[in-house]
From Swiss-Prot:
Coiled coil: none annotated. The record marks 214, 217 as: Transition state stabilizer. Belongs to the sulfate adenylyltransferase family. Catalyzes the first intracellular reaction of sulfate assimilation, forming adenosine-5'-phosphosulfate (APS) from inorganic sulfate and ATP. Plays an important role in sulfate activation as a component of the biosynthesis pathway of sulfur-containing amino acids. The gene is MET3. The record marks 345 as: Induces change in substrate recognition on ATP binding. This is Sulfate adenylyltransferase. It catalyses: sulfate + ATP + H(+) = adenosine 5'-phosphosulfate + diphosphate. Pathway: Sulfur metabolism; hydrogen sulfide biosynthesis; sulfite from sulfate: step 1/3. Keywords: Amino-acid biosynthesis, ATP-binding, Cysteine biosynthesis, Cytoplasm, Methionine biosynthesis, Nucleotide-binding, Nucleotidyltransferase, Transferase. Residues 1-178 are annotated as: N-terminal. Residues 179-410 are annotated as: Catalytic. It is found in: Cytoplasm. InterPro entries: ATP-Sase_PUA-like_dom, P-loop_NTPase, PUA-like_sf, Rossmann-like_a/b/a_fold, Sulf_adenylyltr_euk, Sulf_AdTrans/APS_kinase, Sulfurylase_cat_dom, Sulphate_adenylyltransferase.
Length: 530
């Protein structure tokens, strides 16, 4: 089947390329001294997809009327569906949040220069249509179901500012990327690639992921393509913008995707990266992802169990049901098809007795041996340096993961000393450095002064595999937050002690405390027992 038309019928491409118009715009910016707004990481991701058409039919950040319509009805008020006369489907509010002081200086029709936070490069001009204060509680409840622990709701109340600015965009340039350029394709570029590959009259199923891929993912995507017939193909389309806090970094993941791409039959799959800021919005996010893939020229989209869900809250309650996303998309099937069809994710499992994968819904697990490795177990195996079996993942993928997730024996750590007694703290630092340097291995032991020990510097040293000794008076908690509690040891003077959690007190003599710290480092795998 031919490449589907974009959502709304027109693929937006808002970057102005005419040299004379661009010259006039930059002169206008210089002459009129427009207000400037430096974008946050999420706003930057959103702007890129507005500019390149990934968010078609949007031509800017939502004005108040469109925002309210999306929040309450999952539809745009300004763009109509030609078939039913209703607002066009759009499930996620794309908003530009600003502070009260900045908002108070804006007026309708005014232009704002939007800048990249990394290099201050002007990316776009926004013409103000509306400046409004959203009801964040309503947004939280309608869009994300209201649980205050939901990461998008935490962002809404803890990070997003009080006012939203809606308006249309004139694009000056895309944000600059320096990594994986061949894989960063815009919707226009990806559609052109499909034509070059001869896929423009065939079927393409997109696979969305924010995690590394293993053998099971390769198996399920190949099955999805085969189910489409002899003309089925696969787009591996991972998110490399903002994902869930704690996810594996995109550099590691892209290296994994490059390796696993080689494991597909020739001509079956291609890889492109999506600079999306995920909201982890479950069913609404699945709808959003489907519309985005339509704009990228895909006609089938795999929607998995708990698609784009953030898991469960601190009480163990899931934010979304396992099939909420599939059910919502089925409800709007008539408006999505024939442009894009949802392919329900068929979970596969390994059958060790037969050395093959099979869809779990086709076997009787009470009669057949199955094997699987959970994400938690995989992380533990990486941390311990234990074997990851070949039936689970490819050696090339495991190698990439081990490079980015070394075992504890090669990881760095920080010993954070509460140096309220500066002389004793300095002496303990010296004693620890001397003690730890006597052990064999590649790990360097670095002692920083309180002035040198910013959270960023300590974390960078720990990430490089160093042991860092940090006497500090004020920013102890910030350093531990940056490094992570699993790689931190705390030493305080006359305070609490919990050796099992890496917290030590100098109530005892210095030699005993150093011995306990060394014992703890050995027990956690940072050093091998001699």
């Amino acid at each position: 089947m031919p490449i589907p038309a974009p959502h709304g019928g027109k693929l937006q491409d808002l970057v102005i390329r005419d040299s004379s118009i661009r010259s006039d715009l930059f002169k206008e910016i210089a002459d009129k001294k427009y207000k400037t707004l430096t974008l946050s990481p999420r706003q930057l991701c959103d702007l890129e997809l507005i500019l390149n058409g990934g968010f078609s039919p949007l031509t800017g950040f939502l004005n108040e009327e469109d925002y309210n319509s999306v929040v309450h009805d999952m539809r745009l008020s300004s763009v109509k569906n030609e078939k039913n006369g209703k607002g066009l489907l759009w499930s996620m509010p794309i908003t530009l949040d600003v502070g009260q002081e900045f908002a108070g200086k804006l007026s309708k029709g005014e232009k704002i220069v939007l800048k990249d936070l990394r290099d201050e490069k002007p990316l776009a001009l926004l013409t103000v249509e509306t400046v409004y204060k959203p009801n964040k509680q309503t947004e939280a409840e309608k869009v994300f179901r209201g649980d205050p622990e939901h990461p998008a709701i935490k962002y809404l109340f803890e990070t997003a500012q009080e006012f939203y600015v809606g308006g249309s965009i004139q694009g000056l340039d895309y944000p600059t990327h320096y990594d994986y350029i061949p894989f960063r394709k815009t919707p226009t570029e990806l559609r052109e690639e499909f034509s070059k590959l001869g896929w423009d009259q065939q079927k393409v199923v997109a696979f969305q992921t924010r995690n590394p891929m293993h053998r099971a993912h390769r198996e399920l995507t190949v099955r999805a393509a085969n189910d489409l017939g002899s003309d089925g193909h696969i787009l591996i389309h991972p998110v490399v913008g903002l994902t869930k806090p704690g996810d594996i970094d995109h550099h590691t993941r892209v290296r994994v995707y490059q390796q696993i791409l080689k494991k597909y039959p020739d001509g079956l799959a291609t890889l492109s990266l999506l600079p999306l800021a995920m909201r982890m919005g479950g069913d609404r996010e699945a709808m959003w992802h489907s519309l985005i893939r339509m704009n990228y020229g895909v006609d089938h989209f795999i929607v998995g169990r708990d698609h784009a869900g953030p898991g469960s809250n601190s009480k163990g309650v899931d934010f979304y049901g396992p099939y909420d996303a599939q059910e919502l998309l089925a409800k709007y099937k008539d408006e999505l098809e024939p442009k894009i069809k949802v392919v329900p994710f068929r979970m596969v499992t390994y059958l060790p007795d037969e050395d093959r994968y099979a869809p779990i819904d086709t076997i009787d697990t009470s009669k057949v041996n199955t094997a699987n490795i959970s994400g938690t177990e995989l992380r533990q195996r990486l941390r311990d340096g234990t074997e990851i079996p070949g039936w689970f993942s490819y050696p090339e993928v495991v190698k990439v993961l081990r490079e980015s997730n070394p075992p504890r024996s090669k990881q760095g750590f920080a010993i954070v000393i509460d140096s309220s007694d500066s002389k004793q703290g300095e002496y303990l630092s010296f004693a620890l450095q001397s003690t730890l340097n006597q052990f064999s291995g590649e790990r360097r032991i670095t002692k920083l002064s309180s002035e040198q020990a910013t959270p960023f510097i300590v974390n960078e040293l720990v990430k490089s595999g160093s042991g860092v000794i940090v006497p500090t008076k004020s920013n102890q908690s910030d350093i531990i937050k940056a490094v992570g509690s699993g790689n931190s040891i705390i030493v305080n003077f006359n305070g609490e002690q919990n050796a099992d959690q890496g917290i030590f007190s100098l109530k005892e003599d210095l030699t005993s405390v150093i011995g306990e710290i060394v014992e703890y480092l050995v027990s956690q795998g940072f050093y091998q027992q001699s």
